[in-house]
UniProtKB/Swiss-Prot annotation:
PANTHER family: RIBOSOMAL PROTEIN S7 (PTHR11205). It is found in: Plastid, Chloroplast. This is Small ribosomal subunit protein uS7cz/uS7cy. One of the primary rRNA binding proteins, it binds directly to 16S rRNA where it nucleates assembly of the head domain of the 30S subunit. It comes from the Eukaryota. Part of the 30S ribosomal subunit. GO terms for biological process: translation. The keyword Chaperone does not apply. SUPFAM superfamilies: Ribosomal protein S7. GO terms for molecular function: rRNA binding; structural constituent of ribosome. Signal peptide: none annotated. The gene is rps7-A. HAMAP family: Ribosomal_uS7_B. It comes from Phalaenopsis aphrodite subsp. formosana. Keywords: Chloroplast, Plastid, Ribonucleoprotein, Ribosomal protein, RNA-binding, rRNA-binding.
C-alpha cells in the first residue's frame, strides 16, 4: 500500500471569454500539439457560427448538445471464464461529459466541410436538435448496453 497521500482532485478551469468550464473542456480536447491558442480560435469561431445559425445563446446550444450526447450507461469488456462479455455499467456525470465531448469532436472531424470551426458548429447544432453522428453513437452505446443487460450481474 502506498504511503503517499491521496492526490487532490483538480477542478476544471473556465475559459477567459465565456467563463465556462464546458468550453474549456472542449478546448482541451480539441488541442493538438500544444497549440492552445489555435484551439481557442477554432472554438470561438464555432461559437460565433452557432450564434449566426440559430440566433440564440450559443452556450445554451452547446450545453443542450452535450446534454443530448451524454450517455447514462456504457459497456465494458469483462473476461469471465474463457469468454469476454460486454458488461453494462453506469457512467458518472463527469465521465459522461468527457465521453460526450470526445464523441462530438470525433463526429465533427469526420464531417465533410471546409474547416474545423464550420464542422464543429454544424455538429453542435445538429446534436442540440437531436440528430447527427454523436447522437447516433450514444444511441448505439445504449442499445449495446440494453442487449447485454443479462451480464449486468458480472459487475
Amino acid at each position: 500500500m502506498s504511503r503517499r497521500g491521496t492526490a487532490e482532485e483538480k477542478t476544471a478551469k473556465s475559459d477567459p471569454i465565456y467563463r465556462n468550464r464546458l468550453v474549456n473542456m472542449l478546448v482541451n480536447r480539441i488541442l493538438k500539439n500544444g497549440k492552445k491558442s489555435l484551439a481557442y480560435q477554432i472554438i470561438y469561431r464555432a461559437v460565433k457560427k452557432i450564434q449566426q445559425k440559430t440566433e440564440t445563446n450559443p452556450l445554451s446550444v452547446l450545453r443542450q448538445a452535450i446534454r443530448g450526447v451524454t450517455p447514462d450507461i456504457a459497456v465494458k469488456a469483462r473476461r469471465v471464464g474463457g469468454s469476454t462479455h460486454q458488461v453494462p455499467i453506469e457512467i458518472g456525470s463527469t465521465q459522461g461529459k468527457a465521453l460526450a465531448i470526445r464523441w462530438l469532436l470525433g463526429a465533427s472531424r469526420k464531417r465533410p466541410g471546409r474547416n474545423m470551426d464550420f464542422r464543429l458548429s454544424s455538429e453542435l447544432v445538429d446534436a442540440a436538435k437531436g440528430s447527427g453522428d454523436a447522437i447516433r453513437k450514444k444511441e448505439e452505446t445504449h442499445r449495446m448496453a440494453e442487449a447485454n443487460r443479462a451480464f449486468a450481474h458480472f459487475r
